[in-house]
A protein has these predicted regions:
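A structural signal for isolated positions on well-ordered beta-strands in alpha/beta enzyme cores
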Residues: 26-29, 52, 104-106, 134, ...
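Conserved phosphate-binding/catalytic loop of the ribokinase/pfkB sugar-kinase fold
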Residues: 53-59, 66-101
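Conserved structural-core and active-site-/substrate-pathway-adjacent residues in large, well-folded domains
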Residues: 18, 65, 105-108, 154, ...
């Protein structure tokens, strides 16, 4: 091994991008209390992000390793404890605490057990306080995202929920249905190299 580089992933990557654009960002999540957490703290020290994790001593901080050789990925190793934490209640309290002074909440759901159990409560609180909630979803059940401001699936995630996209007309019909079913203000469907489609209140762009 010639070099090991630690980079923020998941919600941490979203937070870093927003911070780089000048936003005032607070990053929350459930972590272990281990070397991986300490490495993440080191990386985030170089940003203006306020990081206040809920530490669960019974789990490991998620670490996704990429083994690179000759400028290409040779292997991926994931170290994580999916759906093993019972600290979601504490995470919800912390989200509400910081949300009171926020304009926007972004939920990066990687289907690891932190977000899905509290998403509906976060959305309910946010709507009562005129705070927008944007969700980057995972999994095959979006019911807990109902009444969010925006849900942003990619093409694969969208197809898992609505079925394979046959053509543009079919995609638009399915997008409108998902937006209506979840009572969203906006649905943003990302299509990789083919761009994205925005389903808003009055139009599809």
């Amino acid at each position: 091994i010639k070099k090991i580089i630690y980079k923020p992933g998941g919600a941490s990557n979203v937070a870093q991008n927003l911070s780089a654009l000048g936003s005032n960002v607070t990053l929350l999540g459930i972590t272990g209390d281990d070397n991986e957490l300490r490495e993440l703290i080191k990386v985030l020290r170089h940003t203006d992000i306020k990081f206040d994790p809920v530490k669960d001593l019974s789990i490991r901080t998620t670490l996704k390793s990429r083994i690179i050789g000759n400028d290409q990925q040779l292997m991926r190793l994931d170290h994580e404890d999916r759906n093993k934490s019972d600290m979601q209640g504490e995470l919800l309290k912390r989200v509400i605490k910081y949300a009171k002074n926020s304009d926007l909440i972004i939920l990066s759901d990687y289907d690891k057990g932190s977000v899905k159990f509290i998403a509906a409560d976060i959305i309910s609180f946010a709507n009562k306080n005129n705070i927008k909630v944007i969700i980057d979803p995972k999994g095959t059940d979006y019911s807990m995202y109902k009444n969010a401001y925006m849900v942003k699936p990619n093409e694969l995630e969208f197809s898992m929920i609505m079925g394979k996209i046959k053509n543009k007309k079919d995609m638009i019909a399915k997008g409108k249905k998902l937006k209506k079913d979840l009572q969203l203000d906006t649905l943003l469907l990302t299509l990789g190299k083919n761009g994205m489609v925005l389903f808003s209140k009055d139009s599809v762009l």
